[in-house]
Amino acid sequence: MVHWTPEEKQYITSLWAKVNVEEVGGEALARLLIVYPWTQRFFSSFGNLSSASAILHNAKVLAHGKKVLTSFGDAVKNLDNIKKTFAQLSELHCEKLHVDPENFKLLGNILIIVLATRFPKEFTPASQAAWTKLVNAVAHALALGYH
């Protein structure tokens, strides 16, 4: 179980309240597919992923990014029970999709970059530390199905 200070919870929830899940989720997933092209193999049904421009404008990428970030919002709502919150998604990604758990860390790091660029005033070092703790907790919870 992750232990959160009241300040960490505040940094996370106050910034999350400003996040446009569709835009941030789409950008984060698109960046993952561009920066780490080997992750594209999990999205072969998404059509044209041949260039950065194609990925950034791919409706399926953007829609799935929204879906991913909507699920991430469940972590924000359940900070004290992240493992249970992601138990089913962990099983799906492990047993059916066979996603390398390192990819969860990569996406978390990209999410931090996207948040920092979209909210430069709010994304202080203390906020970054809280968000880093959160994305690491989510990545760990998603990887539990591999143990």
From Swiss-Prot:
One CC-aspect GO term: blood microparticle
Keywords: Heme, Iron, Metal-binding, Oxygen transport, Transport
Record GO biological process: hydrogen peroxide catabolic process
Tissue: Red blood cells.
Domain spans labelled Globin: 3-147
Entry GO MF terms: haptoglobin binding; heme binding; metal ion binding; organic acid binding; oxygen binding; oxygen carrier activity; peroxidase activity
Annotated Gene3D superfamilies: Globins (1.10.490.10)
SUPFAM superfamilies reported for this sequence: Globin-like
Pfam families, per database record: Globin (PF00042)
Highest taxon of the lineage: Eukaryota
Binding site for heme b: H64, H93
InterPro entries xrefs: Globin (IPR000971), Globin-like_sf (IPR009050), Globin/Proto (IPR012292), Hemoglobin_b (IPR002337), Hemoglobin_oxygen_transport (IPR050056)
Function comment: Involved in oxygen transport from the lung to the various peripheral tissues.
Summary of subunit composition and partner proteins: Heterotetramer of two alpha-D chains and two beta chains.
Family: Belongs to the globin family.
Name of this protein: Hemoglobin subunit beta
Encoding gene per record: HBB
